[in-house]
Every structure is written in C-alpha cells, then in structure tokens.
UniProtKB/Swiss-Prot annotation:
The lineage of its organism: Eukaryota, Metazoa, Chordata, Craniata, Vertebrata. Residues 615-854 form the Peptidase S1 domain. InterPro entries: CUB_dom, LDL_receptor-like_sf, LDLR_class-A_CS, LDrepeatLR_classA_rpt, Peptidase_S1_PA, Peptidase_S1_PA_chymotrypsin, Peptidase_S1A_matripase, SEA_dom. Interacts with CDCP1. May interact with TMEFF1. Interacts with iripin-3, a serine protease inhibitor from Ixodes ricinus saliva. Interacts with iripin-1, a serine protease inhibitor from Ixodes ricinus saliva. This is Suppressor of tumorigenicity 14 protein. It comes from the Eukaryota. Glycans are attached at residues 109, 302, 485, 772. It is found in: Membrane. It is an enzyme of class 3 (hydrolase). Disulfide bonds join 214-244, 340-366, 397-410, 453-464, 459-477, 471-486, 488-501, 496-514, 508-523, 525-537, 532-550, 544-559, 567-579, 574-593, 587-602, 641-657, 776-790, 801-830. Residues 86-203 form the SEA domain. It comes from Homo sapiens.
Length: 855
C-alpha cells in the first residue's frame, strides 16, 4: 500500500493481515527506534615515531584506563537502567460490527467464547505491531468478557517497556486512546473492527482478574429482582487483600437498575481503604466509573444507579484487615429509554432527571420545551438539585449540567428559580460518560409578570416566600432580598450598619452575623486584653495561666501548650490527680495526661454511618444520624419526652418529664417504655429498634418544678441496650468542658411536648447556636440560673424545629466526636426564630451523673 504522503516515524497507513487498517500518528524519539544506541568506541591516534617520555606513556595509560572504566560504567548503566523493563497494562474494549451476540459469549469456557477471544487477541496483536513504542514490547492480551453492540469485546493488554521509553509509550497510548478504524477494515477473513478504546490500569488488577475465586456473573431474568452480596454477608466480614467482581447483564435493549440495600465497608479515611466501584462497562475502566464507595451508609441513603446499556461491573478491592460485613445489593432490568425530555404545555407541572431520585444514567441528553398560555410568563423552580462530580469545580460545569437561557447549572444547590420573560422556556440536561448523581426535581409554573407571587413576597431570584418572613432577620431568599430596606424590631432585633436586621441574641457572640461585623463592634476589650466569652475583659497575661480568671473557663480554653497547673473547677483533672491547662482535652485523639486517662472510655459520640443523606432546607434527620436519641413513651399516651443514651444501662433526660400530673404517675418507671434506634414513630417494630422498660428514675434532688432549675434526670434501663449501627452512646463532657458562645450545636426530637401536640413522625434536627450568657440573662430577666444555657435557632432555611423535653444537645468536638452539651428544658425545644430556648448545662452535673451511674 504505497503512499506519497510524507510520514513521521513511519506513521502512514499500515496493512495488517487481510485488510485490518490502523493509522499510526506517532513520531520517533531522536530518530531512534526501539531504543537502540551504540557504545562509544576508542579512536586511538598513531604515536609519533620518536618514543614517548615516561610521563607521556603514563598519561596515555591512565587515559586509556579511564576510557575503559567509562565504557564499563556506560555498559553497566545500559544493562541496569536502559534494559530495565516496566510492566504497563491497559484495559479497554473493541467493537466488532459483523458479529452477532449469542448467549454462549457470556460463558468464558464455551467454544464460541474461546474462538472469538482468539480472533480479538490476534487483532490486538496486529494493531500494536504497527504502533511505535508499543508493538515491540507487547507481551500478551486477554479477553475478559463480551456484550451486545453488535459485539463488544472487553480486554486487557500487558506490555514490558524499557524504562527510558515508558513516558513516550504512555503518551502514545494516551493519544491513541480512541482508535477509529475505517468501516471497511478487515482482518482474519471477515472480522470487522470499527473502534478500539483503551485506558491505563493497575497491573495488579490484571493479576487479580486471572483469579476467578471471587468473580461472579449474573443475568437479569424478566422483571425479577436479583440479589447478591459480598462473601459471608452479613454474618462474617468480607475477605481482606482480595479483589471481587460481579458482572451484571440484562437482555438486549434493556438497562440495569442497581441498588445497594446495605453498605458497610472500612472507613474512607484509612490509607488504602477498601473500595467498591461501579462501572458502566464490563471492564474496570476509570473513565466509565459511575461511583466509588467506601465507609458506611444508612439504609435511607440513595445508592441506586442506572446503566446506559445492558451491563454493569461492580468491583470490590480490599486492603484492610478491618472486620466489616460488606454490602447487599439488588438489580433488575428495565426497557431502555426511547427518548428523554419532551414538550410540556400545561399551566404548571413537574419534571425530573431520568430515574430520579435514583442516580441518572451516563451519556444522556434530555430537552424539555415548556410553553404556558400566551398571556403568562413561565418560571422553573428546582426543588432538589444534585449534579456533583468528584474533583470538578461547580462553577465551570464541564461535565454534567442543566442549561437554561444559555446558562449552565451544576454541583449541589439549594432551591433556586429560573425565570423567562416570555411564555416559553427550554431546559436541557446533559450527562457525560462517568460519575453520575441524584439529578434534579423541578416544577414549572405560569405567572403574571405584574404579580409573580400573589399574597407572598417575591425574591429578586423569582422565588416566593411567606410575607411574614420579610424583615425577620433571616435570609430566606438566597439573594437576601427579603432582608433589604427593613425597619428592625428594637425589642428583638439588632440593626446592622448595612441595614440588615439580626436577632439580639447574636450580638457579641464572636460571630460576624451582619456581614460587616457591626454586631461584634463595641464588644471588644482594650488593647493588650483578652475578652472572655461572658464579655469580661482580662489582661492577656491572665490567659492560659491555668486559672479560670474569666469565670467561664474561656481564658483557659484552646491554649496551644499543655501544662500541668494548679487544679481548679475549670481545669481538667487526670486520673493521676494532675490538672491540665488545655481546655476540653477529653477524647480528642491526643494523650495529654501522662497516664493517658483523657483518652480512656472514649467509645462514644461516633456515628456508625460515615455518610449522611443530603437534605437541602429540611429538618428530617437521617437514619442512624443521632444513634443516642431515645424516645420515651408513657403508658397509653405515646411519645412524651426524649432522652440520650450514655451507657448500655443509663439514659439522661429532663426531670420535669417525670412530675406526676393529671392523675398519671409519671414518676413511676413502670409506666414508661424507651425506644432506642427509633427513626419513625410509626415504625417502632422496625429492624434495629430496641424496646426497653425503665427500672429506675433518678431526678436531681434540687430540681425546682417552678423555675426548672436543676432540670435533669437519670433513667436506668431494665435490660441493657445492645450497641449497633442505630444505637450508640453520646460522650459526656468533663465538668471543665466549655461550649463557648457562638458555637453551633444540634438539637433533635420528634417535636412532641408533654401537654399536647401531635409531633412529627420522623426524627427532626435543628442547628442552634450557644448564646452569650449575659445576653441570655438580658433577654429572659430573672429566669436564668447558672445551671441553664440559652441557644438560638441557626438554620434560616427552615421555619422552626420543635425538639423534645429531655432530648440532647449534640456538639461536634475535636476528633469528630459528639458530646452532650445540654438537655432540652424549657422554652421552645428547638427554639423559634428570634426566641431563645433554655437548656440544662450538662458539664455542671458530670460529678452527679458519675456518682449515681458510675459512667
């Protein structure tokens, strides 16, 4: 096949066999092929006729010896470096257009599989033979699977490349990653190959794929739900230092839906952690990975994925010796989508990404053309929006995106609205070949441009909110337009210099809430002084001196150097009797006490599930998110109060829950039932929920049922709780532990009070902030005692969240552990906007708890 076209590196069309053609575009390196170089040769000049002097002879001998040594060194370098071979492996697939897929191709031991695999290996060998820096170093290829389309062959190829050519070989394969061959290309009789795709992979993967001891193949049957698990699930852990894979198939013209029902692997933050990867092919090619998973997930987490064709590959690579049960998964086949998008012509309606709330498939494009009546305008409100891809900045949207009015949207976003200045709007959705997400749920609405939000306030973004949310100090509009040009309520709000209104209890809490820091101005102490959390000013020399000069311990918190100091009620005391200058040292992952006692008894405050579901603007807690939360039911009355689990035998609650009232003996432990691991009040018999009766109720002897001072109680269980993924204890803080003003903490409960209210079925959560004690006393004069703390509601995106009396305040501390800061006492349990709630300070009762429980 001659050609007059100039070629670089012999890169013109080459003829392989009976017509399979491959167009190489690669260049030689320095004009050398196959890395051949020559050793230097001595060029000895003839000596002059007159004999050399002794020194000349000696110099010649030395020079000759030096040249010999250089030659030997070069030879050693050549043998030890240039001839060192590096193993490189690529995996990929080849599309064969003149073959029809038969069922026998699913069995790697069938005659049909072996025959076609042999042809594929021959074709690969021919292709590589014409590629510089690859062909001479090709060792072997293996075919691992076939699938429809017409026939797709999945393979890996191994090369042994001289070390000095590795970089060039990788460049060559990177450039030729997608090889498009002429449609008429033929080799080996009528074997037609139209494309070859290859990607680099780990050589260990190839070695492991040759071991079929943990390799499984499953084919969907009709509409049946198929199940598979890791070896030994759930009674024994999956194998360590292993590679398992599951090749899933469906019928032609179908796609697969895969769901992980239970998922428990070693933590993601461990080096070389165990990893599950789902691929949209039958070969483990990174660019076709849909998701990578590690750690543990609650049952409610969305782990449903969809293929774009009739195959999926799931791999599990384990490196750790940790004992985890692994996963349980199901899959089924469903018809391939014939179209995506469409025309929407009603006045309002909804639409969503394919298979929402499951993950959308890769390689899909959808277009919705929306048209409302002529005299109206149209807007699209995205209620949920998750188009996030690992390592991809959300602002650029180079991969998956939604496009409206020429603007692309991607990443993870809270509710937002896009409007049109006409009665038409077009929404486009695109996903690429890798890493999918949940997608979106949207609604479109027609509106009158002169009154876009009848009876409501219109944000500049087009979103509608209730009128009473206007100028309440909370930014309900994402652009803060509901808080502009407001007149602040002097009794409840602070006027920022930028004219924003903020709750009074956020003033001087060391957090810049106004945005211009005006709520923190006038709170500072003079130069060379330190401002305590309670507002008191001290000389800087008194900070970190081992003494509680502030009175609230804030001058001794977060000191950089840990010193042994004189013991006070505000210093941490080790078991050996020594006290530390460091604030809150317990269970922070560092041994500060010389006897290590600050890191003992730390099996608490950690969730079993390392991943939590994503909820934007909601208050529903996830399953297992607060495993120490307890629901207390009074006989014949249902849920009444909350509590927290601190050990297998003991709960902490509020004393006011156990005051006899209306002829009912709330102080009688036999009248109560505790539900541990509960998430939904209507599912008290669900798996993972533990039901326990109470053996004893110990209310604090100083509890005052009029002022609610000393509002704390201890509850002993009749039968110990069993720790599980849904039931875990919370950490108790030391008596010296400080939860400073401005710190964000969480309150949880089902929103029920002792005297009424239906409450929520699903466990609720609310983020709150510790309020400066002086501010708290000013807001609630003559009502606050030193045993009480105030908090204010923090999450502006949610209207309110009612916690339960007796429930815990959960604070995330050092090392990610969660400590109980307080107990829900009185006021609004989760706090209302601009209204603080009051809670019992738990650190002040640490000694009392230990005296009565031993915990």
């Amino acid at each position: 096949m001659g050609s007059d076209r100039a070629r670089k590196g012999g890169g013109g069309p080459k003829d392989f066999g009976a017509g399979l053609k491959y167009n190489s575009r690669h260049e030689k390196v320095n004009g050398l092929e196959e890395g051949v170089e020559f050793l230097p040769v001595n060029n000895v000049k003839k000596v002059e006729k007159h004999g050399p002097g002794r020194w000349v002879v000696l110099a010649a001998v030395l020079i000759g010896l030096l040249l010999v040594l250089l030659g030997i060194g070069f030879l050693v370098w050549h043998l030890q470096y240039r001839d060192v071979r590096v193993q490189k492996v690529f995996n990929g697939y080849m599309r064969i257009t003149n073959e029809n897929f038969v069922d026998a191709y699913e069995n790697s031991n069938s005659t049909e599989f072996v025959s076609l695999a042999s042809k594929v290996k021959d074709a690969l060998k021919l292709l590589y033979s014409g590629v510089p820096f690859l062909g001479p170093y090709h060792k072997e290829s293996a075919v691992t699977a076939f699938s429809e389309g017409s026939v797709i062959a999945y393979y890996w190829s191994e090369f042994s490349i001289p070390q000095h050519l590795v970089e060039e070989a990788e460049r060559v394969m990177a450039e030729e990653r997608v090889v498009m061959l002429p449609p008429r290309a033929r080799s080996l009789k009528s074997f037609v190959v139209t494309s070859v795709v290859a990607f680099p992979t780990d050589s260990k993967t190839v070695q492991r794929t040759q071991d079929n001891s943990c390799s499984f193949g499953l084919h969907a049957r009709g509409v049946e739900l198929m199940r598979f698990t890791t070896p030994g699930f759930p009674d024994s852990p999956y194998p360590a230092h292993a590679r398992c894979q599951w090749a899933l198939r469906g019928d032609a013209d179908s796609v697969l839906s895969l769901t992980f029902r239970s998922f428990d692997l070693a933590s993601c933050d461990e080096r070389g952690s165990d990893l599950v990867t789902v691929y949209n092919t039958l070969s483990p090619m990174e660019p076709h990975a849909l998701v990578q998973l590690c750690g543990t997930y609650p049952p409610s987490y969305n782990l449903t994925f969809h293929s774009s064709q009739n195959v999926l590959l799931i791999t599990l690579i384990t490196n750790t010796e940790r004992r985890h049960p692994g996963f349980e998964a199901t899959f089924f086949q469903l018809p391939r989508m014939s179209s995506c998008g469409g025309r929407l012509r009603k006045a309002q309606g909804t639409f969503n990404s394919p298979y929402y709330p499951g993950h959308y498939p890769p390689n899909i494009d959808c277009t919705w053309n929306i048209e409302v009546p002529n005299n109206q305008h149209v807007k699209v409100r995205f209620k949920f929006f998750y188009l996030l891809e690992p390592g991809v900045p959300a602002g650029t949207c180079p991969k998956d995106y939604v496009e409206i009015n020429g603007e692309k949207y991607c990443g993870e976003r809270s509710q937002f609205v896009v409007t049109s200045n006409s009665n038409k709007i077009t929404v486009r959705f695109h996903s690429d070949q890798s890493y999918t997400d949940t997608g979106f749920l949207a609604e479109y609405l027609s509106y009158d441009s002169s009154d876009p939000c009848p009876g409501q306030f219109t944000c500049r973004t087009g979103r509608c909110i209730r009128k009473e949310l206007r100028c309440d100090g909370w930014a309900d509009c994402t652009d803060h337009s509901d808080e502009l040009n407001c007149s602040c309520d002097a009794g409840h709000q602070f006027t920022c210099k930028n004219k924003f209104c903020k709750p009074l209890f956020w003033v001087c809490d060391s957090v810049n809430d106004c945005g211009d820091n005006s709520d923190e101005q006038g709170c500072s102490c003079p130069a060379q002084t330190f401002r305590c959390s309670n507002g008191k000013c001290l000389s800087k020399s008194q900070q970190c001196n081992g003494k509680d000069d502030c009175g609230d311990g804030s001058d001794e918190a977060s000191c950089p150097k840990v010193n042994v100091v004189t013991c006070t009620k505000h210093t941490y005391r080790c078991l050996n009797g020594l006290c530390l200058s460091k604030g809150n040292p317990e269970c922070d992952g560092k041994e500060d006490c010389s006897d290590g006692s600050d890191e003992k008894d730390c099996d608490c405050g950690l969730r079993s599930f390392t991943r939590q579901a994503r909820v934007v603007g909601g208050t529903d807690a996830d399953e297992g998110e607060w495993p120490w939360q307890v629901s207390l039911h009074a006989l014949g009355q249902g849920h009444i109060c909350g509590a927290s689990l601190i050990s297998p035998n003991w709960l902490v609650s509020a004393a006011h829950c156990y005051i006899d009232d209306r002829g009912f003996r709330y102080s009688d432990p036999t009248q109560w039932t505790a539900f541990l691991g509960l998430h939904d009040q209507s599912q008290r018999s669900a798996p993972g929920v533990q039901e326990r009766r109470l053996k004893r109720i110990i209310s604090h002897p100083f509890f005052n049922d009029f002022t609610f001072d000393y509002d704390i109680a201890l509850l002993e269980l009749e039968k110990p709780a069993e720790y599980s993924s849904m039931v875990r204890p919370i950490c108790l803080p030391d008596a010296s532990h400080v939860f400073p003003a401005g710190k964000a903490i969480w309150v949880t409960g089902w929103g029920h009070t002792q005297y009424g209210g239906t409450g929520a079925l699903i466990l609720q959560k609310g983020e709150i902030r510790v309020i400066n004690q002086t501010t708290c006393e000013n807001l609630l004069p003559q009502q606050i005692t030193p045993r009480m703390m105030c908090v204010g509601f923090l999450s502006g995106g949610v209207d309110s969240c009612q916690g339960d009396s007796g429930g815990p305040l959960s604070s995330v501390e050092a090392d990610g552990r969660i400590f109980q800061a307080g107990v829900v006492s009185w006021g609004d349990g989760c706090a209302q906007r601009n209204k603080p709630g009051v809670y019992t300070r738990l650190p002040l009762f640490r000694d009392w708890i230990k005296e009565n429980t031993g915990v």
